[in-house]
A protein has these predicted regions:
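Conserved catalytic/coupling modules of large nucleotide/cofactor-utilizing molecular machines
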Residues: 274, 281-528
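Acidic-enriched and Gly/Ser
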Residues: 2-17, 23-26, 32-150
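Flexible beta-alpha connector loops of hexameric P-loop NTPases
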Residues: 144-150, 175, 202-207, 230-247, ...
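Conserved P-loop
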Residues: 180-228, 253, 260
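Phosphate-binding/switch loop-helix module in NTP-utilizing enzymes
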Residues: 243-279, 331-332
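Loop/turn-to-beta-strand initiation segments
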Residues: 199-201, 228-231, 262-266, 337-342
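P-loop NTPase nucleotide-binding/switch module
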Residues: 88-90, 97, 101-104, 117-167, ...
Length: 528
């Protein structure tokens, strides 16, 4: 029997069977926890860990590498420290911190890791794009000048401090001056674009706020029909400092998902003061050297690399496709002409704009809207100090009709304020001065706008034309806003084509004559 078995056949059978064995062994690079405290862990043994890499603890908690030292790695925890003990095993994921994004996120409230926190179940992330949290800003050749307006629906902003798509415009002021209100009104105003099939996707990033405040804001957006095109990224005061630090980066990554696919997007960071405080906390626990006001030396770089990611991308498809630092998943899906507009918010203490973080962000952004407590308390809302508010993009981010009508409004209002200061000391004044003061006061009343009631740009141009050209001379100061409402109601019913023409950026003699005729009828009823 044995003489029938050939050794070559045995070896052949063994080789065939060995080929079928799946070698499923996988080696994970692991380390052990040395110390853990205040949301930071030090880990020994991860010699090949990279900066910003995700690590996974054996209990499922995730962390991000921040410090690379000779004998250990310092990482910030994206969860609670309870359950993490000395000696616990930590493994590398070999993935840089990122967030998975797709259109199913619209209308949802998520945390900086992309997990839903609104109680509506998990988000379907099938075919989602993996967008890195930290990414280089597009280079100069991949950008184009900001030239398209981002309508906020606020007369004071759209006429005097215009914001363009791709711009970074800082909203700065003390607490309780209406900073968030401006950002929320801007988001609500994008509803008409969404309904017209030209959506501006909005991302609202809440950093270090009370969970109840975020819930109220989400409810407000729902009531005004703004949630279908909005994503809320929430890192509340109860979340670890690392989550508050990374929340704006998650917002920017989601914004880039829309921007790189050719859509306009708007991201609101509310507010970066709290992000800087969270970053300071994490840095001090990691024993990084501190600088001015105990902030780490690279706090300027923290905000500059975040805000530089806002851009208007080149229209040329072949140029946009070559964009630097493009995530692998985005290749083949890039479309030129997209934009990411940033509205960072900074809270000042007692109106001090010369503090460390405010001056940093002012120098990074393309202008600022400065809100004042005094104006707010006097009833001028939005409480914008036009004198020191500025948009460095200017008229190139306005439609032609608005530019023509409101081009001198900012200077006129500044002159009015100077004259008003002098008029307090003077008993008699000439007719020109009296007229300038009257027009300035009435324009101030026109620029007052209730919260959550953004105005379409065509209507803005029409009413500002009346204010700038002194068509409301006969109207008493306390009846200006009542007159405005009557004028707009009549214009909508009797000459809707005027509003459409102005919204399209055109203004001609026929249009202005209709505006003057309608206002003359309304103003005539106020003659004493």
């Amino acid at each position: 029997m044995s003489d029938k078995i050939k050794p070559s056949e045995v070896s052949q059978v063994l080789l065939e069977q060995l080929k079928g064995i799946q070698n499923a062994e996988q080696f994970d690079e692991v380390g052990t926890v040395l110390t853990v405290s205040d949301g930071v862990a030090r880990i020994y043994g991860l010699r090949n860990a990279e900066a910003n890499e995700l690590l996974e603890f054996e209990n499922g908690t995730m962390a991000i590498v921040m410090n690379l030292e000779e004998d250990n790695v310092g990482c910030v925890l994206l969860g609670t420290t309870s359950g993490i003990k000395e000696g616990m095993v930590v493994k590398r994921t070999k993935r840089i911190a990122s967030i998975r994004v797709n259109d199913n996120m619209l209308g949802r409230v998520i945390n900086p890791l992309g997990q839903a926190v609104d109680g509506k179940g998990d988000i379907d992330l099938k075919d989602a794009f993996e967008m890195p949290l930290d990414r280089k800003a597009p280079g100069v050749i991949y950008r184009q000048p900001v030239k398209e307006p981002l309508q906020t629906g606020l007369k004071a902003v759209d006429s005097m401090i215009p914001i363009g798509r791709g711009q970074r415009e800082l909203i700065i002021g003390d607490r309780q001056t209406g900073k968030t209100a401006i950002a929320v009104d801007t988001i609500i105003n994008q509803k008409s674009f969404y309904e017209a099939g030209k959506p501006v996707y909005c991302i609202y990033v809440a950093i270090g706020q009370k969970a109840s405040t975020v819930a109220t804001l989400v409810q407000t957006l729902k009531e005004h029909g703004a949630m279908p095109y909005t994503i809320v990224v929430a890192a509340t005061a109860a979340d670890p400092a690392a989550m508050q630090y990374y929340a704006p980066f998650a917002g920017a990554a989601i914004g880039e998902y829309f921007r790189d696919r050719g859509f306009p997007a708007l991201v609101v960071y509310d507010d970066l003061s709290k992000q800087a405080v969270a970053y300071r906390e994490v840095s001090l626990i990691l024993r990084r050297p501190s600088g001015r006001e105990a902030y780490p030396g690279d706090v300027f770089y923290l905000h500059s690399r975040l805000l530089e990611r806002a851009a208007k991308i080149n229209e040329q498809q072949e140029v946009a496709e070559q964009m630097n630092d493009l995530p692998a998943c985005m290749k083949g899906h890039v479309k030129g002409g997209g934009s990411l507009t940033a509205l960072p918010i900074i809270e000042t203490q007692a109106g001090d704009v010369s503090a460390y973080i405010p001056t940093n962000v002012i120098s990074i952004t393309d202008g600022q809207i400065f809100l004042e407590s005094d104006l707010f308390n006097q009833g001028f809302r939005p409480a914008i100090n036009v004198g020191i508010s500025v948009s460095r993009v200017g008229g190139s981010a306005q439609i032609k009709s608005m530019k023509k009508v409101a081009g001198t409004l900012k200077i006129d209002q500044a002159q009015y304020r100077e004259l008003e200061a002098f008029s307090k000391f003077s008993s008699d004044m000439d007719a020109v001065t009296a007229m300038t003061l009257d027009r300035g006061r009435k324009n101030n009343q026109l620029l007052i706008q209730p919260q959550y009631s953004p105005m379409p740009v065509g209507e803005q141009v029409a009413i500002l034309y009346c204010g700038v050209h002194g068509l409301m001379r006969e109207v008493p100061i306390d009846k200006v806003r009542e007159c405005q409402n009557q004028f707009l109601d009549k214009l909508r019913s009797s000459a809707p084509e005027v509003i459409e023409t102005l919204a399209a950026g055109k203004i001609d003699d026929a249009t202005t004559q209709k505006i003057e005729a309608v206002m003359a009828d309304i103003a005539g009823t106020y003659k004493s």
